[in-house]
């Protein structure tokens, strides 16, 4: 389905995390196809129902998690909100709030390092709510994240990542693209 929707890209990419990769999953391409998005999200919704109980709110980081979070929320009948970056920090805006003691599930399109979902977990904590876990379409974390809660994913996808100073020769020869939505300034 990733190839069919042109969501699996090959080349030289700088990920939102700052790491480099020779493959990139552009979930926006997958989600731009309603039929395929519904199929993927329906399957993920079933896994979520099986693994997480009593979800009051779905919280997604902008940009990538918004569509996935909304569709999962629609299918589960759960309120869905999102956090967006203000001055480089994920924040609740637009009147969104998380009531104290709410059970919150974080949903993202792709998890690699876990940075965005950990920021969302921080928002849940400062609102004195409960983090029930994480869900995503693509889990690229290779079990390297520092997450303490369970990740439910539709696809576990192992893609090699490299630090800028440890690029393989073949990758250094390919022009760089920066497709992610998080702007990291160094």
PLM region spans:
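Short, glycine/charge-rich flexible loops or terminal/linker lids adjacent to PRPP-binding catalytic cores
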Residues: 63, 68-105, 113-115
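PRPP-dependent phosphoribosyltransferase catalytic core
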Residues: 1, 121-186
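A contiguous pocket-lining binding segment that forms or flanks enzyme active sites
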Residues: 95-135
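Short, well-ordered alpha-helices that flank and scaffold nucleotide-derived cofactor binding pockets
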Residues: 46, 50, 70, 74, ...
């Amino acid at each position: 389905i990733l190839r069919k929707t042109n969501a699996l890209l090959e080349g030289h990419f700088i990920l939102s995390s700052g790491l480099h990769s020779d493959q990139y999953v552009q979930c926006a391409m997958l989600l731009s196809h309603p039929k395929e998005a519904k199929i993927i999200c329906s399957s993920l919704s079933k896994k979520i129902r099986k693994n997480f109980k009593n979800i009051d709110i779905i919280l997604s980081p902008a940009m990538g998690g918004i569509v996935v979070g909304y569709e999962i929320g629609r299918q589960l009948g759960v309120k869905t909100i999102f956090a967006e970056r203000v001055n480089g920090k994920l924040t609740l805006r637009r009147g969104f709030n998380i009531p104290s003691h709410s059970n919150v599930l974080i949903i993202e399109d792709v998890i690699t390092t876990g940075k965005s979902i950990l920021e969302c977990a921080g928002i849940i904590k400062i609102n004195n709510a409960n983090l029930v876990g994480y869900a995503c379409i693509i889990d690229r974390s290779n079990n390297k994240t520092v997450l303490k809660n369970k990740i439910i994913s539709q696809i576990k996808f192992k893609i090699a990542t490299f630090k800028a100073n440890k690029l393989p020769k073949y990758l250094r020869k390919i022009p760089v693209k920066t497709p992610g939505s998080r702007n990291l300034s160094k």
